[in-house]
């Protein structure tokens, strides 16, 4: 039986404006709220009722989880939040329009920053203090960096709940979920460039006690 549900947050205000978002804490758009509600409905129709919830520390992830769980009467779920599930930090690209970055730097560099595995964008020069984080946030991250900070959390915190027989819901971001799916499906560093996780559609797996996926992920319905 499928025991892991991955859900990318719904469309955000900056997704709507085609801006690089990263760790900037923006809210869901009206479309994103509808996507989150639909995600909850899909969980109900598929009879996928999670026992525990994991989210990032970013509002769009938390909003999506709350709206989806309202649809299945599970807002009371035990909940764990971690910066390790945050979106990839896009460095100095954060807040910039993707089309303008593409025009300025060209398709090859743009795709390397956006979809490549081990190429971080240009870093920020400094980072404002944020009470959510005990240590200073990164100034930029590649997808490899995201995977390196996510996998210890997966193995040490999330996986034990699956081994204990729980159904786990992880509501996170395009790149943190790409990093996890890369691990679960053993996707190569090259092929992961083609992997995209759509907003607001539950992606389900069956995870065995060793932490391996027994089948490729499938989207509901």
Curated annotation (Swiss-Prot):
Highest taxon of the source?
Bacteria
Which SMART domains did the record assign?
Answer: PGAM (SM00855)
Residues at which substrate binds:
8-15, 21-22, 60, 87-90, 98, 114-115, 174-175
In chain numbering, where does the site feature Transition state stabilizer fall? 173
Matches recorded under Pfam families: His_Phos_1
Q: In which pathway does it act?
A: Carbohydrate degradation; glycolysis; pyruvate from D-glyceraldehyde 3-phosphate: step 3/5
Show the segment(s) annotated as Disordered: 114-140
Q: Molecular function terms in GO for this entry?
A: phosphoglycerate mutase activity
**Which reaction(s) does the protein catalyse, per the Swiss-Prot or TrEMBL entry?**
(2R)-2-phosphoglycerate = (2R)-3-phosphoglycerate
EC number(s) on file: 5.4.2.11
Q: What keywords were assigned to this record? A: Gluconeogenesis, Glycolysis, Isomerase
- What is the active site of this protein? 9 (tele-phosphohistidine intermediate), 87 (proton donor/acceptor)
According to its UniProt entry, the protein's GO biological process terms are:
gluconeogenesis; glycolytic process
The answer on whether this UniProt entry bears the keyword Isomerase reads: yes
Q: Name the job this protein performs.
A: Catalyzes the interconversion of 2-phosphoglycerate and 3-phosphoglycerate.
Q: Which family does it belong to?
A: Belongs to the phosphoglycerate mutase family. BPG-dependent PGAM subfamily.
Protein name (record): 2,3-bisphosphoglycerate-dependent phosphoglycerate mutase
Query: In the UniProt record, what gene is named as encoding this protein?
Result: gpmA
């Amino acid at each position: 039986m499928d025991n892991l549900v991955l859900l990318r947050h719904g469309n955000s205000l900056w997704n709507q404006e085609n801006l690089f978002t990263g760790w900037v804490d923006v809210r869901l758009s009206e479309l994103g709220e509808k996507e989150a509600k639909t995600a909850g409905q899909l969980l109900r129709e598929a009879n996928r009722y999670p026992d525990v919830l994991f989210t990032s520390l970013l509002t769009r992830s938390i909003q999506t989880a709350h709206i989806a769980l309202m649809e299945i009467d599970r807002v009371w779920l035990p909940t764990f939040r971690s910066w390790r599930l945050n979106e990839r930090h896009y460095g100095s690209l954060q807040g910039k329009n993707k089309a303008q970055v593409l025009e300025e730097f060209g398709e090859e560099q743009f795709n390397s920053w956006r979809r490549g595995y081990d190429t971080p964008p240009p870093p920020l020069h400094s980072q404002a203090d944020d009470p959510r984080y005990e240590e200073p946030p990164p100034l930029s991250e590649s997808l490899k960096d995201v995977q390196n900070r996510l996998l210890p959390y997966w193995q040490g915190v999330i996986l034990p709940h699956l081994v204990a027989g729980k159904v786990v819901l992880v509501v996170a971001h395009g790149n943190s979920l790409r990093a996890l799916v890369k691990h679960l499906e053993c996707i190569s560093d090259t092929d992961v460039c083609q992997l995209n996780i759509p907003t607001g559609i539950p992606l389900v797996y069956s995870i065995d006690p060793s932490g391996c996926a027994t089948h490729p992920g499938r989207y509901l319905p």
